[in-house]
């Protein structure tokens, strides 16, 4: 019975598959790595005021755009299927550093 429920959920996962050339909108996965679940997101300006980006020197090339995700962990397809989805903010981040402690270039997405 559980196997058949998992098979029924596959079309929903196909809707969340990456779309070639598409942006990071609702129902789309990350092109730069796994979708992240972040306990907090903030603007780059706020993160700089709080000194959160000082340790990233040399890691991020170019200007930082988007949001900064804090205390993030990757979301797996299995986690979504079993109901262990994100209860905070789901984001797609360009640069994941310090094992998800600080992620930069994040864009909120819906699963």
From Swiss-Prot:
Disruption of the gene: reported phenotype:
Does not affect the formation of aerial structures but leads to gas channels in fruiting bodies that are easily filled with water.
Q: Where is the signal peptide?
A: 1-25
SMART domains from the xrefs? Answer: HYDRO (SM00075)
The protein's matches in InterPro entries, at most eight in alphabetical order, are given as: Hydrophobin, Hydrophobin_CS
**Source species, domain of life:** Eukaryota
Q: Which UniProt keywords apply?
A: Cell wall, Disulfide bond, Fruiting body, Glycoprotein, Secreted, Signal
* Cystine pairs: 30-37, 38-72, 86-92, 93-106
Q: Which Pfam families match?
A: Hydrophobin
Q: What induces it?
A: Expression is regulated by the mating-type genes in the secondary mycelium, and especially activated by both the MATA- and MATB-controlled pathways.
Q: Which Gene Ontology cellular component terms are annotated?
A: extracellular region; fungal-type cell wall
Which residues are glycosylated according to the annotation?
Answer: 39
Q: Where in the cell is it found?
A: Secreted; Secreted, Cell wall
Give the GO molecular function terms: structural constituent of cell wall
Keyword Signal (UniProt): yes
In UniProt terms, what function does this protein have?
Answer: Aerial growth, conidiation, and dispersal of filamentous fungi in the environment rely upon a capability of their secreting small amphipathic proteins called hydrophobins (HPBs) with low sequence identity. Class I can self-assemble into an outermost layer of rodlet bundles on aerial cell surfaces, conferring cellular hydrophobicity that supports fungal growth, development and dispersal; whereas Class II form highly ordered films at water-air interfaces through intermolecular interactions but contribute nothing to the rodlet structure.
Oligomeric form and interacting partners: Self-assembles to form functional amyloid fibrils called rodlets. Self-assembly into fibrillar rodlets occurs spontaneously at hydrophobic:hydrophilic interfaces and the rodlets further associate laterally to form amphipathic monolayers.
> Which family, according to the similarity comment?
Belongs to the fungal hydrophobin family.
Q: What is this protein called?
A: Class I hydrophobin SC4
Source species of the chain: Schizophyllum commune (Split gill fungus)
* Gene name for this UniProt entry: SC4
């Amino acid at each position: 019975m559980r196997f058949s429920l998992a098979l029924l959920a596959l079309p929903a996962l196909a809707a969340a598959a990456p779309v070639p050339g598409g942006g990071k909108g609702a129902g789309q996965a990350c092109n730069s790595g796994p979708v992240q679940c972040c306990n907090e997101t903030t603007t780059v300006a706020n993160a700089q005021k709080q000194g959160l980006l000082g340790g990233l020197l040399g890691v991020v090339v170019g200007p930082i755009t988007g949001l900064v995700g804090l205390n993030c962990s990757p979301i797996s397809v299995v986690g979504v299927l079993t109901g262990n989805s994100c209860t905070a903010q789901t984001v797609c981040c360009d640069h994941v550093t310090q094992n998800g402690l600080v992620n930069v270039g994040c864009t909120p997405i819906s699963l």
